[in-house]
Amino acid sequence: MKPATATISREALRHNIELIKTFAPQQKLLAMIKANAYGQGLLPAADTLADLVEGFGVARLREALEIQETGYTGKILLIEGFFDREELLKTLSRRFDTVIHCQEQLELLEQVAEEWQQEQQKGFWKRKAKIYFPINVWLKIDTGMHRLGVHPEQVDMFYQRLKACPLVESISFVSHFSRADEPDCGYTEKQIAIFEAATSPYPTHERSISASSGILYWKQAHYDWVRPGIIMHGISPHYTPITDLGFKPVMTLSSSLIAVRTHKAGEPVGYGGTWISDKDTKLGVVAMGYGDGYPRNAPEGTPVLVNGRIVPIVGRVSMDMLTVDLGADSQDKVGDEVIFWGKDLLIEEVAQHIGVISYELITKLTPRVIFEYE
Protein backbone atom coordinates (compact mmCIF):
# COMPACT_ATOMS: atom_id res chain seq x y z
CA MET A 1 0.00 0.00 0.00
CA LYS A 2 1.44 3.36 -1.08
CA PRO A 3 0.46 6.92 -0.20
CA ALA A 4 0.32 9.61 -2.88
CA THR A 5 2.90 8.74 -5.54
CA ALA A 6 3.84 10.31 -8.87
CA THR A 7 5.47 7.80 -11.18
CA ILE A 8 7.50 9.45 -13.95
CA SER A 9 8.31 7.51 -17.11
CA ARG A 10 11.68 8.57 -18.51
CA GLU A 11 10.99 6.42 -21.57
CA ALA A 12 7.78 8.34 -22.28
CA LEU A 13 9.59 11.67 -21.88
CA ARG A 14 12.28 10.67 -24.36
CA HIS A 15 9.66 9.27 -26.72
CA ASN A 16 7.77 12.56 -26.68
CA ILE A 17 10.90 14.56 -27.50
CA GLU A 18 11.65 12.28 -30.44
CA LEU A 19 8.06 12.76 -31.59
CA ILE A 20 8.36 16.55 -31.29
CA LYS A 21 11.35 16.38 -33.61
CA THR A 22 9.09 14.98 -36.32
CA PHE A 23 6.93 18.11 -36.04
CA ALA A 24 9.98 20.41 -36.23
CA PRO A 25 12.72 18.37 -37.94
CA GLN A 26 14.90 21.31 -38.97
CA GLN A 27 14.75 23.23 -35.71
CA LYS A 28 16.79 23.19 -32.53
CA LEU A 29 14.95 22.27 -29.34
CA LEU A 30 15.02 24.38 -26.19
CA ALA A 31 13.24 22.15 -23.69
CA MET A 32 11.30 24.23 -21.20
CA ILE A 33 11.86 22.69 -17.78
CA LYS A 34 10.76 25.67 -15.72
CA ALA A 35 8.62 25.21 -12.60
CA ASN A 36 10.42 22.02 -11.60
CA ALA A 37 10.00 20.67 -15.15
CA TYR A 38 6.25 21.24 -14.99
CA GLY A 39 6.14 19.51 -11.64
CA GLN A 40 7.89 16.37 -12.87
CA GLY A 41 11.34 16.98 -11.40
CA LEU A 42 13.90 19.50 -12.67
CA LEU A 43 17.10 17.48 -12.43
CA PRO A 44 15.64 14.12 -13.51
CA ALA A 45 14.14 15.84 -16.56
CA ALA A 46 17.41 17.56 -17.41
CA ASP A 47 19.31 14.30 -17.04
CA THR A 48 16.79 12.43 -19.20
CA LEU A 49 16.79 15.01 -22.00
CA ALA A 50 20.36 16.33 -22.05
CA ASP A 51 21.44 14.26 -25.05
CA LEU A 52 18.25 14.91 -27.03
CA VAL A 53 17.91 18.70 -27.00
CA GLU A 54 20.12 21.69 -27.75
CA GLY A 55 19.34 23.51 -24.52
CA PHE A 56 17.01 24.17 -21.62
CA GLY A 57 14.76 27.07 -20.71
CA VAL A 58 14.03 28.00 -17.10
CA ALA A 59 12.24 30.86 -15.36
CA ARG A 60 14.48 31.29 -12.32
CA LEU A 61 18.24 31.62 -11.91
CA ARG A 62 18.15 29.01 -9.15
CA GLU A 63 16.91 26.44 -11.65
CA ALA A 64 19.73 27.26 -14.05
CA LEU A 65 22.31 26.96 -11.29
CA GLU A 66 20.98 23.59 -10.18
CA ILE A 67 21.17 22.22 -13.71
CA GLN A 68 24.67 23.53 -14.32
CA GLU A 69 25.93 22.19 -11.01
CA THR A 70 25.18 18.65 -12.22
CA GLY A 71 27.90 19.10 -14.83
CA TYR A 72 25.66 20.10 -17.72
CA THR A 73 27.58 22.40 -20.07
CA GLY A 74 24.94 23.17 -22.70
CA LYS A 75 22.76 26.19 -23.28
CA ILE A 76 20.47 27.37 -20.47
CA LEU A 77 18.16 30.30 -21.16
CA LEU A 78 16.62 32.49 -18.46
CA ILE A 79 13.27 33.14 -20.12
CA GLU A 80 12.40 36.13 -17.91
CA GLY A 81 15.96 37.36 -17.80
CA PHE A 82 17.73 38.54 -14.65
CA PHE A 83 15.79 40.21 -11.84
CA ASP A 84 18.55 42.36 -10.35
CA ARG A 85 22.26 43.17 -10.47
CA GLU A 86 23.30 40.13 -8.45
CA GLU A 87 21.45 37.82 -10.82
CA LEU A 88 23.01 39.51 -13.83
CA LEU A 89 26.50 39.04 -12.42
CA LYS A 90 25.83 35.35 -11.84
CA THR A 91 24.38 35.06 -15.33
CA LEU A 92 27.57 36.54 -16.76
CA SER A 93 29.92 34.43 -14.65
CA ARG A 94 28.02 31.22 -15.46
CA ARG A 95 27.52 32.14 -19.14
CA PHE A 96 23.78 31.58 -19.14
CA ASP A 97 21.73 32.92 -22.03
CA THR A 98 19.30 35.61 -20.95
CA VAL A 99 16.18 37.27 -22.26
CA ILE A 100 16.16 41.06 -22.32
CA HIS A 101 12.59 42.33 -22.31
CA CYS A 102 12.69 45.86 -20.92
CA GLN A 103 14.64 49.09 -20.69
CA GLU A 104 15.67 48.47 -17.09
CA GLN A 105 17.40 45.20 -17.95
CA LEU A 106 19.19 46.79 -20.89
CA GLU A 107 20.44 49.70 -18.81
CA LEU A 108 21.69 47.41 -16.05
CA LEU A 109 23.56 45.29 -18.58
CA GLU A 110 25.14 48.40 -20.10
CA GLN A 111 26.15 49.67 -16.66
CA VAL A 112 27.83 46.40 -15.72
CA ALA A 113 29.50 46.24 -19.14
CA GLU A 114 30.97 49.72 -18.65
CA GLU A 115 32.36 48.70 -15.26
CA TRP A 116 33.72 45.50 -16.81
CA GLN A 117 35.48 47.46 -19.55
CA GLN A 118 37.10 49.71 -16.98
CA GLU A 119 38.39 46.64 -15.17
CA GLN A 120 39.77 45.22 -18.40
CA GLN A 121 41.83 48.36 -18.90
CA LYS A 122 43.63 47.86 -15.61
CA GLY A 123 46.76 45.80 -15.30
CA PHE A 124 46.14 42.09 -14.79
CA TRP A 125 47.13 42.10 -11.12
CA LYS A 126 44.87 45.06 -10.36
CA ARG A 127 41.72 43.49 -11.70
CA LYS A 128 39.02 42.20 -9.38
CA ALA A 129 38.83 38.45 -9.02
CA LYS A 130 35.41 38.14 -10.65
CA ILE A 131 35.49 37.07 -14.29
CA TYR A 132 32.56 37.75 -16.59
CA PHE A 133 31.98 36.46 -20.08
CA PRO A 134 30.01 37.84 -23.01
CA ILE A 135 26.69 36.04 -23.22
CA ASN A 136 23.92 35.30 -25.69
CA VAL A 137 20.98 37.68 -25.38
CA TRP A 138 17.48 36.89 -26.60
CA LEU A 139 15.61 40.13 -27.27
CA LYS A 140 11.97 39.61 -26.33
CA ILE A 141 9.47 41.27 -28.67
CA ASP A 142 5.85 41.86 -27.67
CA THR A 143 3.90 40.72 -30.72
CA GLY A 144 0.52 40.61 -29.01
CA MET A 145 0.78 38.68 -25.76
CA HIS A 146 1.18 42.06 -24.01
CA ARG A 147 2.97 40.56 -21.05
CA LEU A 148 6.73 40.93 -21.58
CA GLY A 149 8.77 42.32 -24.43
CA VAL A 150 9.79 45.49 -26.21
CA HIS A 151 7.38 47.10 -28.64
CA PRO A 152 8.12 46.30 -32.29
CA GLU A 153 9.09 49.90 -33.00
CA GLN A 154 11.73 49.68 -30.24
CA VAL A 155 13.48 46.63 -31.65
CA ASP A 156 16.16 48.46 -33.62
CA MET A 157 17.07 50.74 -30.73
CA PHE A 158 17.47 47.76 -28.41
CA TYR A 159 19.32 45.81 -31.09
CA GLN A 160 21.85 48.58 -31.75
CA ARG A 161 22.56 49.07 -28.06
CA LEU A 162 22.93 45.33 -27.48
CA LYS A 163 25.20 45.06 -30.50
CA ALA A 164 27.40 47.79 -29.05
CA CYS A 165 27.55 46.15 -25.62
CA PRO A 166 30.84 44.31 -25.03
CA LEU A 167 29.15 41.76 -22.78
CA VAL A 168 26.82 40.60 -25.56
CA GLU A 169 28.19 37.79 -27.69
CA SER A 170 25.15 37.23 -29.90
CA ILE A 171 21.56 38.44 -30.28
CA SER A 172 18.53 36.28 -30.99
CA PHE A 173 14.89 37.29 -31.23
CA VAL A 174 12.09 35.66 -29.25
CA SER A 175 8.37 36.16 -28.76
CA HIS A 176 5.41 34.18 -27.46
CA PHE A 177 1.99 33.31 -28.86
CA SER A 178 -1.08 34.07 -26.77
CA ARG A 179 -3.71 32.06 -28.67
CA ALA A 180 -1.79 29.44 -30.64
CA ASP A 181 -4.09 26.74 -29.29
CA GLU A 182 -6.97 28.40 -31.18
CA PRO A 183 -5.96 27.72 -34.79
CA ASP A 184 -8.96 29.48 -36.30
CA CYS A 185 -9.02 32.69 -34.28
CA GLY A 186 -6.80 34.71 -36.64
CA TYR A 187 -4.72 36.26 -33.86
CA THR A 188 -1.70 34.02 -34.32
CA GLU A 189 -1.32 35.04 -37.97
CA LYS A 190 -1.25 38.64 -36.76
CA GLN A 191 1.50 37.86 -34.26
CA ILE A 192 3.54 36.04 -36.90
CA ALA A 193 3.28 39.03 -39.24
CA ILE A 194 4.43 41.42 -36.50
CA PHE A 195 7.34 39.14 -35.59
CA GLU A 196 8.37 38.82 -39.24
CA ALA A 197 8.29 42.57 -39.76
CA ALA A 198 10.23 43.28 -36.58
CA THR A 199 12.99 40.74 -37.25
CA SER A 200 13.33 40.77 -41.04
CA PRO A 201 16.02 43.50 -40.98
CA TYR A 202 18.28 41.03 -39.15
CA PRO A 203 18.25 37.91 -41.36
CA THR A 204 21.36 36.31 -39.87
CA HIS A 205 20.00 36.22 -36.32
CA GLU A 206 18.18 33.25 -34.84
CA ARG A 207 14.49 33.48 -33.97
CA SER A 208 11.97 31.64 -31.81
CA ILE A 209 8.25 32.11 -31.24
CA SER A 210 6.74 28.61 -31.10
CA ALA A 211 6.16 26.83 -27.80
CA SER A 212 3.98 23.71 -27.48
CA SER A 213 0.93 24.89 -29.42
CA GLY A 214 3.10 26.57 -32.01
CA ILE A 215 4.96 23.33 -32.57
CA LEU A 216 1.74 21.39 -33.10
CA TYR A 217 -0.24 23.85 -35.20
CA TRP A 218 1.97 26.57 -36.69
CA LYS A 219 4.72 24.99 -38.77
CA GLN A 220 5.27 28.26 -40.64
CA ALA A 221 6.43 29.82 -37.36
CA HIS A 222 8.99 27.25 -36.24
CA TYR A 223 11.98 29.42 -37.28
CA ASP A 224 15.32 28.38 -35.73
CA TRP A 225 14.33 27.25 -32.24
CA VAL A 226 11.17 25.68 -30.85
CA ARG A 227 10.41 25.60 -27.15
CA PRO A 228 8.44 22.48 -26.15
CA GLY A 229 6.88 22.56 -22.70
CA ILE A 230 3.70 20.77 -21.68
CA ILE A 231 3.68 18.48 -24.72
CA MET A 232 6.98 16.94 -23.61
CA HIS A 233 4.97 15.38 -20.80
CA GLY A 234 2.35 13.97 -23.14
CA ILE A 235 -0.19 16.58 -22.07
CA SER A 236 -2.18 18.82 -24.38
CA PRO A 237 -1.90 22.61 -24.12
CA HIS A 238 -5.71 22.62 -24.19
CA TYR A 239 -8.42 20.15 -23.19
CA THR A 240 -8.24 17.94 -26.30
CA PRO A 241 -5.82 15.06 -25.58
CA ILE A 242 -2.80 14.62 -27.87
CA THR A 243 -2.35 10.89 -27.32
CA ASP A 244 -3.92 10.34 -30.74
CA LEU A 245 -0.87 12.15 -32.16
CA GLY A 246 1.37 9.57 -30.53
CA PHE A 247 2.30 11.39 -27.31
CA LYS A 248 2.60 9.35 -24.13
CA PRO A 249 1.64 10.63 -20.65
CA VAL A 250 4.81 10.88 -18.57
CA MET A 251 3.24 11.11 -15.09
CA THR A 252 0.91 8.70 -13.36
CA LEU A 253 -0.49 10.03 -10.08
CA SER A 254 -1.74 7.30 -7.78
CA SER A 255 -2.44 6.36 -4.19
CA SER A 256 -4.19 3.56 -2.32
CA LEU A 257 -7.47 2.71 -0.68
CA ILE A 258 -6.89 2.94 3.05
CA ALA A 259 -10.45 1.99 4.00
CA VAL A 260 -13.51 0.41 2.38
CA ARG A 261 -16.77 1.12 4.20
CA THR A 262 -20.40 0.18 3.79
CA HIS A 263 -22.60 3.24 3.57
CA LYS A 264 -26.36 3.53 3.95
CA ALA A 265 -28.68 5.55 1.75
CA GLY A 266 -29.51 8.97 3.17
CA GLU A 267 -26.24 9.35 5.07
CA PRO A 268 -23.89 12.28 4.30
CA VAL A 269 -20.16 12.06 3.59
CA GLY A 270 -17.30 14.37 4.52
CA TYR A 271 -16.99 17.94 5.72
CA GLY A 272 -20.23 19.85 5.46
CA GLY A 273 -22.17 16.72 4.53
CA THR A 274 -22.36 17.99 0.95
CA TRP A 275 -22.96 14.56 -0.61
CA ILE A 276 -25.74 12.24 0.50
CA SER A 277 -26.03 8.81 -1.05
CA ASP A 278 -29.39 7.93 -2.58
CA LYS A 279 -28.69 4.20 -2.19
CA ASP A 280 -26.72 1.74 -0.11
CA THR A 281 -23.18 1.57 -1.42
CA LYS A 282 -19.54 1.05 -0.54
CA LEU A 283 -17.19 3.96 -0.10
CA GLY A 284 -13.43 3.95 -0.57
CA VAL A 285 -11.24 6.30 1.42
CA VAL A 286 -8.08 7.26 -0.48
CA ALA A 287 -4.81 8.65 0.87
CA MET A 288 -4.85 11.79 -1.27
CA GLY A 289 -5.90 15.32 -0.40
CA TYR A 290 -5.19 18.96 -0.95
CA GLY A 291 -2.14 18.53 1.29
CA ASP A 292 -0.74 16.51 -1.61
CA GLY A 293 -1.80 19.12 -4.15
CA TYR A 294 -5.02 17.51 -5.32
CA PRO A 295 -7.53 20.35 -5.78
CA ARG A 296 -9.89 20.91 -2.87
CA ASN A 297 -12.43 22.27 -5.33
CA ALA A 298 -12.65 19.00 -7.28
CA PRO A 299 -16.42 18.56 -7.57
CA GLU A 300 -18.40 15.47 -6.80
CA GLY A 301 -18.23 13.16 -9.79
CA THR A 302 -14.60 13.90 -10.62
CA PRO A 303 -13.32 10.61 -12.07
CA VAL A 304 -10.63 8.38 -10.59
CA LEU A 305 -9.62 4.88 -11.65
CA VAL A 306 -9.93 1.89 -9.32
CA ASN A 307 -9.14 -1.59 -10.59
CA GLY A 308 -9.66 -0.57 -14.19
CA ARG A 309 -12.98 1.23 -13.81
CA ILE A 310 -13.96 4.86 -13.38
CA VAL A 311 -15.53 5.77 -10.05
CA PRO A 312 -16.56 9.24 -8.82
CA ILE A 313 -15.22 11.34 -5.99
CA VAL A 314 -17.98 12.07 -3.46
CA GLY A 315 -17.98 14.67 -0.70
CA ARG A 316 -15.33 17.30 -0.20
CA VAL A 317 -11.64 16.69 -0.72
CA SER A 318 -9.93 17.09 2.66
CA MET A 319 -6.28 17.69 3.51
CA ASP A 320 -5.12 14.09 3.61
CA MET A 321 -7.98 12.04 2.20
CA LEU A 322 -10.83 11.93 -0.24
CA THR A 323 -13.74 9.55 -0.69
CA VAL A 324 -14.96 7.69 -3.77
CA ASP A 325 -18.18 5.79 -4.42
CA LEU A 326 -17.10 2.23 -5.24
CA GLY A 327 -20.65 0.95 -5.80
CA ALA A 328 -22.68 -1.59 -3.86
CA ASP A 329 -21.17 -4.58 -5.68
CA SER A 330 -17.59 -3.47 -5.21
CA GLN A 331 -14.98 -6.13 -4.57
CA ASP A 332 -12.27 -3.54 -3.99
CA LYS A 333 -10.15 -3.90 -0.89
CA VAL A 334 -7.78 -1.91 1.28
CA GLY A 335 -4.43 -1.50 -0.45
CA ASP A 336 -5.82 -1.41 -3.98
CA GLU A 337 -4.31 1.23 -6.25
CA VAL A 338 -6.24 4.38 -7.12
CA ILE A 339 -5.12 6.32 -10.21
CA PHE A 340 -5.89 10.04 -10.47
CA TRP A 341 -4.38 10.54 -13.91
CA GLY A 342 -2.09 8.71 -16.30
CA LYS A 343 -2.31 6.76 -19.54
CA ASP A 344 -5.62 5.10 -18.60
CA LEU A 345 -7.27 8.26 -17.24
CA LEU A 346 -5.99 11.30 -19.10
CA ILE A 347 -5.23 14.41 -17.11
CA GLU A 348 -7.06 16.57 -19.66
CA GLU A 349 -10.34 14.85 -18.74
CA VAL A 350 -9.71 15.34 -15.04
CA ALA A 351 -8.74 18.99 -15.49
CA GLN A 352 -11.82 19.75 -17.54
CA HIS A 353 -14.05 18.14 -14.94
CA ILE A 354 -12.48 20.19 -12.15
CA GLY A 355 -12.48 23.40 -14.20
CA VAL A 356 -8.73 24.00 -14.22
CA ILE A 357 -5.98 23.49 -16.80
CA SER A 358 -3.65 20.50 -16.77
CA TYR A 359 -0.70 22.80 -16.08
CA GLU A 360 -2.15 23.60 -12.66
CA LEU A 361 -2.65 19.97 -11.69
CA ILE A 362 0.90 18.85 -12.43
CA THR A 363 2.68 21.90 -11.01
CA LYS A 364 0.79 22.04 -7.70
CA LEU A 365 1.77 18.65 -6.31
CA THR A 366 3.40 19.14 -2.92
CA PRO A 367 6.66 17.72 -1.53
CA ARG A 368 4.63 15.15 0.40
CA VAL A 369 4.01 13.27 -2.84
CA ILE A 370 6.54 10.50 -3.44
CA PHE A 371 8.24 10.75 -6.84
CA GLU A 372 9.46 7.57 -8.49
CA TYR A 373 11.35 7.52 -11.80
CA GLU A 374 11.39 4.56 -14.10
UniProtKB/Swiss-Prot annotation:
Catalytically driven reaction(s): L-alanine = D-alanine
N6-(pyridoxal phosphate)lysine found at: K34
Cofactor(s) required for function per UniProt: pyridoxal 5'-phosphate
Membrane-traversing stretches: none
Keyword Isomerase appears in the UniProt entry: yes
Active-site residue numbers: K34 (proton acceptor), Y271 (proton acceptor)
Biological processes per GO annotation: D-alanine biosynthetic process
The family this protein is said to belong to: Belongs to the alanine racemase family.
Protein name, per record: Alanine racemase
Organism of provenance: Actinobacillus pleuropneumoniae serotype 5b (strain L20)
Highest classification ranks of the organism: Bacteria, Pseudomonadati, Pseudomonadota, Gammaproteobacteria, Pasteurellales
Name of the encoding gene: alr
